[in-house]
Amino acid sequence: MTGSLWLSLALSLAVLAQFKVSAAPNLVCFYDSQGFQRQGLAQFSMTDMELALQFCTHLVYGYAGVNADNYEMQSINKRLDLEQRHLAQVSSLKERYPHIKFLLSVGGDADTNEGNQYIKLLESGQQGHRRFIESARDLVRRYNFDGLDLALQLPRNKPRKVHGDVGSAWKSFKKFFTGDFIVDTDSETHKGQVTALIKDLSAALKQNDLLLSLTVLPNVNSSWYYDAPSIAPSLDFINLGTFDFLTPQRNPEEADFSAPTYEAVGQNRLGHYNLNFQTEHWLLQRVPANKINIGIATYGRTWKMTKDSGDSGMPVVPSTQGPAPAGPQSKKEGLLNWAEICSLMPNPGNTNARGPSAPVKRVLDPTKRYGSYAFRAADENGDHGLWISYDDPDSASSKAMFARVRNLGGVALFDLTQDDFRGQCTNDRFPMLRAIKYRLL
C-alpha cells in the first residue's frame, strides 16, 4: 500500500473515531440501591431498572465502602448486597443488555460507618493501597461487573458564610491569598497519594479488562486532591458532581440555586459554584473533553422559609431555617425527588389546599443559566414556608446540550431512583432520564 493510501486510511479512521465519540455520548445512570428497599411509591423494582436501561450506556451500582481497619473494599449493606444477592441480581442484567457497562461504585457519601476512612486509606501506604486494590478487583470480578467507580469521600470546601459587604470584601481578599478556606493542611500530600492509588488501581483492573471511572463528589475541591493531567490517562471517564453546590444542610440561613449552569453574579455568590466553572477547570487541566461527564441530579434541595424570608421568593432568600420537612416518598429532610416536586406545582388536586399541601409558585429560568425554583411563602404564623431549587426535564435537557456542544463525554445522572420512574406527574416514566437521552442523540 502506498504512503498516500496509508495517509488516506489514517485520516478516515480519525474522522470515524471522532464521529463515534460525538454520535455515542455517555449517559451514566447511577443507581442508589437503597431505592430497592424503600416502601410504597418510592420502591424501585428490577422492572423499573430494565425500563431505564433502554436509555443508559453505563449503570453504576451504589454503593460499596472501605473497611477502616484493613482498607479493604466491602459491602456496606450485606443483607441487601450479599444475602439477598442484589449485587448479582443487578449485574446479571448484562446478559440481556450486553451493550451496557455495569460498574460498582465505592464511597459516594453512602459510606458513613467511619468519618475519615478514605483519608486513612490514602495515608496507609503501598500495603494499604494493595489491600484495597486487590479487594476491589476481587469484588468487581466476583459479581461480574465491568469495572469500578471511585467516588472518594474527601474533605469538602467550607460552605459560604452569610455576611455583609464588608465581610464579603474581606472574604474575597482572604480567598485570593489563602485559597478557598483550607480544610486539609495535608492536601498536597493527599493529592500525590490519590494519584498513586488511581494509577495502581487502573493497572490492576486493566489486567482483567475492567474499567475505572472517577466520580468527583459535590464540594470536593478538585485542585486540592486531583492531579488531573497525571490521573486522566488512567481513567476511562470522570463524573463531575456539578450539583448540590448549596444545600440546606451546608447553607441553612439562606437559599439559592443549588446547581446553576453559569455563575449567578452578585449577592456574595462564589464564582466556582456552577457547572461551567467546574467543567472548565478540568478542561484547562488538559483532560480530554470526551472523558468528562457532567452530573445532573433528579432531586431538588429544599429550605424552610420564614416570615423574615419575605414573599418574593427571589434568590438569594434570607433568613431560612435549614432543611424543609422530608417528602412522603424520599423521606429525607431538605430533599424532594422529581415526582414530589412536580406534585406541589399548581394542579386541579391542590388548588384549594392549605398548609403543607398548598401549591408552590413555579419560577422558570428562560435563560437556562441558573435553574428553576419554586416557593411557598410562610403563612401569617410563619409556618409552611418552602423554597425549592431543582432541575426539571427542560433544564436537564439544556445541560445535556451543554455537554454535547462542548464535545464532552456525556452526562452522569444522580440517580435513577429519584426520577419520576412511575410517571406520577405526567404519566411519562423517567422524564429526566428521557429528556437527557433525547438531547444527547
Curated annotation (Swiss-Prot):
Record-linked InterPro entries: Chitinase_II/V-like_cat, Chitinase_insertion_sf, Glyco_hydro18_cat, Glycoside_hydrolase_SF, Glycosyl_Hydrlase_18, IDGF
Chief localization: secreted
Subcellular locations according to the entry: Secreted
Sugar-bearing residue positions: N221
GO biological process, one term: imaginal disc development
Keywords: Developmental protein, Disulfide bond, Glycoprotein, Secreted, Signal
Record's comment on post-translational modification: Glycosylated.
PROSITE patterns the UniProt entry points to: GH18_2
Cysteines engaged in disulfide bonds, as pairs: C29-C56, C342-C425
Domain GH18: 25-441
Single annotated GO MF: chitin binding
Top-level taxon of the source organism: Eukaryota
Segment forming the signal sequence: 1-23
UniProt GO cellular component terms: extracellular region
Role played: Cooperates with insulin-like peptides to stimulate the proliferation, polarization and motility of imaginal disk cells. May act by stabilizing the binding of insulin-like peptides to its receptor through a simultaneous interaction with both molecules to form a multiprotein signaling complex.
Protein name per Swiss-Prot or TrEMBL: Chitinase-like protein Idgf3
